[in-house]
Amino acid sequence: MTLTKVELADNLIEKLHLNKRDAKELVENFFEEIRVALETGEDVKLSGFGNFELRDKSSRPGRNPKTGESVPVSARRVVAFKPGQKLRARVEKTKPKS
């Protein structure tokens, strides 16, 4: 199962008794704040959850999987998520789905 933004909004409606429009707006604004922070080069630290950070990847040689041809992979910036200790501990307690 995958948790979507719509389901997050539905959970806010149920748990916080928000109306649908406010819940959807809250979810959208939350993620927009994270996007804007990352776009401006800031790391995002969510206490008890984890950190979103920017990492610069250097250029490197790559390979086209279809042809086997060597192709350069250009330098780029990527977003990485590092879970916090509390999140890691809670996830480690869960049983894997079979």
UniProtKB/Swiss-Prot annotation:
GO molecular function: DNA binding; structural constituent of chromatin
Gene Ontology BP terms: DNA recombination; positive regulation of metabolic process; regulation of DNA-templated transcription; regulation of translation
SMART domains named in the record: BHL
Keyword Transcription appears in the UniProt entry: yes
InterPro entries: Hist_DNA-bd (IPR000119), Histone-like_DNA-bd_CS (IPR020816), IHF-like_DNA-bd_dom_sf (IPR010992), IHF_alpha (IPR005684)
Signal peptide: none
Cellular-component GO terms for this entry: cytosol
Subunit-level organization: Heterodimer of an alpha and a beta chain.
Protein name per the record: Integration host factor subunit alpha
Source species of the chain: Pasteurella multocida (strain Pm70)
